[in-house]
């Protein structure tokens, strides 16, 4: 058997036992894990330091290194996320619908685990813990394949998960880490249809596209955030500038950070001037990649290429497009959007409603930063990712997104005539 086949076989077996765990047992194990991760802080930080040092040696940008870096506060935040998942209602066994039909059959539709989840993700080691917590709470086994940049951190965290399961008398193969980070093994995982029920990629555009093209397993697409903010002619310009600065600069390396700015021509001159002024006042610097009209209105800008409008920069860079109309803004955003999060800043209620209806994205904001697209903020607890597709799940994916449904039919000897 190949390496992936062994992991898959182990996961399939483990999925049968975890599916039968009671809510109380799952919650107790999750709380044990949270305590154990905090207790293992020094070990985890030591291993994370190896990843960070390697990343710096490889010339990875400081913004991307920050995604990788752990500290005591971030480890405590990881533990807090596990506690929050433990406190959430368990969807497994929930009756979605139920009725007795004309034949006297009692038909229930219940929530059940998906089975075995595989996840391929990049950089941030906290993702491994979030993914396990949600998968475990919903009675699933999970195979984690992180990037080579975080292999030492992920190994330390998964070892803690497996030890917690073993110490509580449960199969440690409920969670497994693919320790071989080669592309060959990753592609083998994408073909493991005999063992894996769903594959969730979480990372950059290249990773997502590779998984979509090569996976034979059903895929839930997540992550890529070419996010826009449209400043309407009826916007409060001061509020608009504050929102843009927050959405672009608070944490530019995450998928809900804004990447594109679309501005109505009627207020472009005043707004762009005010935006640059407020950026200077807040000691922030953003490189604007602008169209011809915006280029004449901005001090710190370069001419945009066509590819810039479709790029998730994950940096202090932002494309800028000036539009002649509200309708053109919607058309522009729908052309370049990755269907993650989009926003309009306006005091025109009618336009706000039309924008939310017509823009094709999982989350559409009016007068708020796109940085709020997050499982915790939406009340889901930790998220396994933000789905940008329409089937099965869309937007931040919490517990319910990791379940399926099953019909339970009970009779008293009925036969079909």
Swiss-Prot record:
Its EC number is 1.2.1.41. Its main location: cytoplasm. GO terms for molecular function: glutamate-5-semialdehyde dehydrogenase activity; NADP binding. It is an enzyme of class 1 (oxidoreductase). The keyword Amino-acid biosynthesis applies. GO terms for cellular component: cytoplasm. It comes from Streptococcus agalactiae serotype III (strain NEM316). This is Gamma-glutamyl phosphate reductase. Pathway: Amino-acid biosynthesis; L-proline biosynthesis; L-glutamate 5-semialdehyde from L-glutamate: step 2/2. Catalyzes the NADPH-dependent reduction of L-glutamate 5-phosphate into L-glutamate 5-semialdehyde and phosphate. The product spontaneously undergoes cyclization to form 1-pyrroline-5-carboxylate. It catalyses: L-glutamate 5-semialdehyde + phosphate + NADP(+) = L-glutamyl 5-phosphate + NADPH + H(+). GO terms for biological process: L-proline biosynthetic process. Gene3D superfamilies: Aldehyde Dehydrogenase, Chain A, domain 1 (3.40.605.10), Aldehyde Dehydrogenase, Chain A, domain 2 (3.40.309.10). Keywords: Amino-acid biosynthesis, Cytoplasm, NADP, Oxidoreductase, Proline biosynthesis. Belongs to the gamma-glutamyl phosphate reductase family. It is found in: Cytoplasm.
